[in-house]
Amino acid sequence: MDQLLASVHAAGHSFLGDYWLLVWTLVKIVAVVLPLMGCVAYLTLWERKVIGWMHVRHGPNRTGPAGLLQPIADALKLLLKEIVVPAKSSKALFVIAPIMTIMPALAAWAVIPFGPEAALANVNAGLLFVMAITSLEVYGVIVAGWASNSKYAFLGAMRASAQMISYEIAMGFVLVIVLMVSGSLNLSEIVMLQTSGRFADMGLTFLSWNWLPLLPMFVIYIISGTAELNRHPFDVVEGESEIVAGHMVEYSGMSFAMFFLAEYANMILISMMATLMFLGGWSSPIDAMPFTWIPGWIWLGIKTLFVVTLFIWFRASFPRYRYDQIMRLGWKVFIPLTLVYLLIVAIWMKTPWNIWH
C-alpha cells in the first residue's frame, strides 16, 4: 500500500507539479466525506430496523429489497422540499446556522485515523483538535434558535447550549484521563499503546484495551456523548410534547437535513472516538487466526457499529429525563466522578502496579 501511494504521489507530482498537493488534499477530503454521508444515510435505516426489532416489528421494508432504498427516498424527499424562511426571522443567520452546525461535524473527521497511517491529517494534537472543533457546534444551535424568532426554537436552543456545554466538561475530563495513561494526543499512538502489555503478549489483546481499567470513564463518555448529541433519553431540547422540534422547529427541506446530518455524523464520530480511545481501534481482539485475517479497518467498523448500536438501544429502552435531572446528572454526578477517577489514575500511575508504562 505504501509503495502504491508513493507511486501515485510521484505520478501526480510529475503531471501537476505544485498543484498536486491541493488536488491530493481534495481527493482525501472527498474519500472521507462521501463514505461518511453514506454511513449517515444508512445509519438512519439501521436505527429504524433495530428499534423495529426491539418493538417486535419489521421496520422499513417497502422501499427496495428489505427497505435498503429507504435512505435514498428520504434524501430525495428532503431535497425536493421547499426551504421556508420565516418572515420575521433574521434571514442571513437563519440560513447560516445549519452550515455552522454541520461544518464542525465534518471537519473533526480530518484527524480520525482509519489505520496506522490512514488519516486525512495525522496531527500530534488530534485528541485536542476533535474536542475543540466539536465544541463549536453549539454556536450553530444558538444562532438557529435566535434567528428563527420563535419562542419554541429559542427555548430549545437555550436548553441545547446549556446541556452541550455541561456534558462537554465531563467528556473533556475523560479525554484528559486518556491523555494521562497514553502520554500522547495523537490518536494513532493512543491505539498502538493499547496493543502492548502483559495480556497483549499472551494474545488476549482485548484485555489490554483501555475499556477494562477505565471502564467507569468509558461508561461516562458514552452517556455524556448521548447528552452531547441531544439524543434520547436526553432529548428535552426537541421534546415533542413540550417544544416540538426545539431549535429546528422552523427549518424544512435541506436546512433541516443539515441538522439531521450533523447529529448522525457526530454520533458516528463519538462512537469512533470511543473505539479509538477505549476499544483498541483497528486492532483485533485476539492476536491469533482467524481474527488476524480480518483487516484492521473492518475491526474498526465493527467496534464503531457496536457503540452506535448502544446509542440506538438507549433510545429504544429509556424514557426521557426531565431537564433538571439531566443537569443534575452532569454537574453533580459525572463531573465529580471524572475528577475523582482522574486523581485515582494519577496515583495508580505512580505505584508499582502501573499497567500503562
Swiss-Prot record:
One GO biological process term: aerobic respiration
The keyword Translocase is assigned to this record: yes
Domain of life the protein comes from: Bacteria
Cellular component terms (Gene Ontology): plasma membrane
UniProt catalytic activity: a quinone + NADH + 5 H(+)(in) = a quinol + NAD(+) + 4 H(+)(out)
Keyword vocabulary terms for this entry: Cell inner membrane, Cell membrane, Membrane, NAD, Quinone, Translocase, Transmembrane, Transmembrane helix, Ubiquinone
Enzyme Commission code(s) on record: 7.1.1.-
Recorded GO MF terms: NADH dehydrogenase activity; oxidoreductase activity, acting on NAD(P)H, quinone or similar compound as acceptor; quinone binding
Transmembrane segments: 20-40, 92-112, 127-147, 165-185, 203-223, 259-279, 294-314, 329-349
Subcellular location: Cell inner membrane
InterPro entries: NADH_UbQ_OxRdtase_su1/FPO (IPR001694), NADH_UbQ_OxRdtase_su1_CS (IPR018086)
Membrane topology: Multi-pass membrane protein
Function recorded in the entry: NDH-1 shuttles electrons from NADH, via FMN and iron-sulfur (Fe-S) centers, to quinones in the respiratory chain. The immediate electron acceptor for the enzyme in this species is believed to be ubiquinone. Couples the redox reaction to proton translocation (for every two electrons transferred, four hydrogen ions are translocated across the cytoplasmic membrane), and thus conserves the redox energy in a proton gradient. This subunit may bind ubiquinone.
Family that this chain belongs to: Belongs to the complex I subunit 1 family.
Quaternary context: NDH-1 is composed of 14 different subunits. Subunits NuoA, H, J, K, L, M, N constitute the membrane sector of the complex.
Protein name as catalogued: NADH-quinone oxidoreductase subunit H
Organism: Herminiimonas arsenicoxydans
